[in-house]
């Protein structure tokens, strides 16, 4: 929810925030904002090369998407300021990755997912328990789910055709099959029923489908 995200940002922006010697406060401030504002998977974010980010036109080139799907991901200037600031303060001559490990090379997912779940979420007052008893509960991948739901809601609020919104969002997220987006968004609300029913047809008509 918006309230939970505000608490998460409050935690990572706090001067009292402390992580291990490999991961600075600025790293988490920038990474979590990137994931929340773009819907990137954690692995995609950590795979980003400095050269994959166009700081002038505010576009990210994702070359390591799931299923070898490449795509362009635009971002707002407000996020761009964080990315530029991080790059200026953290990048060193010879670095390849945008989030280069202090020891060189790509950072590992595990420590980051653990810190988010065991450190940041509890400090934000967010329960680690699953809401339905079946899923794994909130984790860093939940930021992608939150982005997707917010994006669809915003498109509908702006008066855009909801029948076309889902397939375009599917492409933005790097899905090759709209059913992945349907499951991912958990469209169980009554107002989205028609979107699911016509989603396959729209995906084939507008984007040509694929799996």
PLM region spans:
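Conserved catalytic core of the tyrosine transesterase superfamily
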Residues: 1-211
